[in-house]
Amino acid sequence: MNNYFNKLTFIQKIKHLGQCRLMKKNEFSDGVRALLSKKIVIIGCGSQGLNQGLNMRDSGLNITYALRRDSIINQSQSYIRAMKYGFSVGTYDELIPEADFVINLIPDKYHESLIQKIEPLMKYKAVLGYSHGFHIVEIGVKIRQDITVIMVAPKCPGTEVRQEYQRGFGVPALIAVHEENNAYGTGMELAKSWACSIGSNKAGVLESSFVAEVKSDLMGEQTVLCGMLQVGSIFCFDKMVEDGLDSGYAGKLVQNGWEVITEALKQGGITLMMDRLSNVSKLRAFELSDQLKNILTPVFEKHMEDILDGSFSKNMMLDWINKDCKLLSYRQNNSQLLFEKAPVYCETILEQTYFDHGVLMVAIIKASVELAFDIMVKSGIKPESAYYESLHELPLIANTIARKRLYEMNMVISDTAEYGNYLFSDFVLPLLKKEFVPYLKRGDLDLSHVNNIVHIDNILLRDINEMIRTHPIEKVGVQLRSYMKDMVSLSF
């Protein structure tokens, strides 16, 4: 595929993929000063557009929304949202020519046509912002040289961007300046100011590149973040129902279980998550995790290869041309899942029960997080970026499932993430049912094994604990989580 990334030399590709630096807190001492006097126009009022705009306004910035003329006339959902929260709204022709800083927060599929419309309207030396670099990297359209192009990519859905800000904190973000569009050398200061305005400076910011953000983001969302949560939800629910468990209980265990289990992941990595299990369950989860890795490694590697060479993007863009035929078909099929239709279970499930009854769910998380991290790092992506795109974002995506199951997750994430998620889960789910089910035991999704007398091999337990603690993702996780010590814990 002839895109920006594929036009780079091999050395340039390695450089861009490996661009990653954890920024120091004192680098953000100027706060939002660089943007205080700017007229900022956000295009798009979806999940990221609305919630970033709310944070930026609360940080003292001047925010308006530019929408298509027909969206205003017909009072689209974006128009209704912007008006509900008291923002000024105008057309592209009305707002873009006066804007100092234009932030493009519409879905990836519309970026190319949008830039064709707004670039002639943008004033000399204006700034163009993205929160995902797909248009720059995968399509590769050149932006006018006098325009500075920057990115702030929060590592979570838009709803969580707002919630963490309202808690007085923020979410980690990757920031970058497109090296072909930084003629005046102001891009980084503006990107830092933008990051401060949404609260990311409080949670950890990586200085990255458009390439590293796009390739790691696509890999994370397709595999561990959305793909495996979807596969795991369907697989675990179906298995419990097949084993005779009440469908309401099974639905609640899965729906809320990801959030409860990954809260431990957020606070203390895989080590803490595994420590919430009994010794018997920990040994079993470790064993199941290894089996999953053996089955899934070729699949994860294939997704990474397709992302790097552009095959994934090419096929998705063909679906755009075909009016999202595949995406809409996947979406319809997903709405008919038994898990999505499971009855509400009204009785309380205690926090520890989610761990005790969800050994398989813990194993799925461990396997997919470590596998995605390892493959990204092998591909040239730095451990810090790989951590944010695997372990860190997982609890934030799990929170969406806890609200309204897979429907909520797929509604909140981008169309790009949703398409990749379906592509992954459509292949992996039958694979696991064929190759992984034979390894399962009754106790992997209930407590039946706990009452059995099991001899614990102390040496084996010691060695497994050591392997868990010394995995590279645990080492980088300790450093990155230190920036998030003010993060509020969820209670269940």
UniProtKB/Swiss-Prot annotation:
Pathway: Amino-acid biosynthesis; L-isoleucine biosynthesis; L-isoleucine from 2-oxobutanoate: step 2/4; Amino-acid biosynthesis; L-valine biosynthesis; L-valine from pyruvate: step 2/4. Keywords: Amino-acid biosynthesis, Branched-chain amino acid biosynthesis, Magnesium, Metal-binding, NADP, Oxidoreductase, Repeat. GO terms for biological process: isoleucine biosynthetic process; L-valine biosynthetic process. Mg(2+) 1 binds at D217, E221. Substrate binds at S414. It catalyses: (2R)-2,3-dihydroxy-3-methylbutanoate + NADP(+) = (2S)-2-acetolactate + NADPH + H(+); (2R,3R)-2,3-dihydroxy-3-methylpentanoate + NADP(+) = (S)-2-ethyl-2-hydroxy-3-oxobutanoate + NADPH + H(+). NADP(+) binds at C45, G46, S47, Q48, R68, S76, S78, G158. Its cofactor is Mg(2+). The active site is at H132. Residues 209-344, 345-487 form the KARI C-terminal knotted domain. The keyword Amino-acid biosynthesis applies. GO terms for molecular function: ketol-acid reductoisomerase activity; magnesium ion binding. Binds 2 magnesium ions per subunit. Mg(2+) 2 binds at D217, E389, E393. NCBIfam families: ilvC (TIGR00465), PRK05225.1 (NF003557). This is Ketol-acid reductoisomerase (NADP(+)). It comes from Blochmanniella floridana. The lineage of its organism: Bacteria, Pseudomonadati, Pseudomonadota, Gammaproteobacteria, Enterobacterales. The gene is ilvC.
